Amino acid sequence: TDYTLANGTLTISAGSTSGTITIGSIVDDSLDEANETVIVTLSSPSNATLGSDDAHTYTITDNDSAPVVDFNTTSSNGAESTSSKALTVDLSAASAQDVTVDYAVTGTATGSGTDYTLANGTLTISAGSTSGTITIASIVNDSLDEANETVIVTLSSPSNATLGSDSVHTYTINDNDNAP
């Protein structure tokens, strides 16, 4: 609950022209969230007529910073025989909103199933969560003697978050084949 206010009756004393309804105890939480509204509606007056302005909307403006999104490590490696690699993307704090971040895939390894499978995309970290995973899948254990190859994943264009300094992760596929 972000505030306290119960249904009730407003009494305007004889001779007065106004009364006050107090929204009490607005909670200053630390959760990044959208602005929220409280709508107070007047109804069923006695000894008076209800005017056209029978509702008031009060906006609780969120004052919390959006979380930072970035990789929890900037590099990792594994042998060709590793079938997949999960890259963890972290938020600095949970958010009350879904966070999305785009990612682009580059590097010296060839995607589309030749060396691995992972296309450019968008990661969604659900509201309340603090991390998500991008998976480099189907890492191919070929029999070619070749140099180690890299898969570079770069984060960009977050929504409901700001981009952190660790926005690039380099995964190295270590060749495990002997020279002919």
Could you say what each language-model-derived stretch is?
Residues T1-P180:
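Short boundary segments that mark the start of a structured unit
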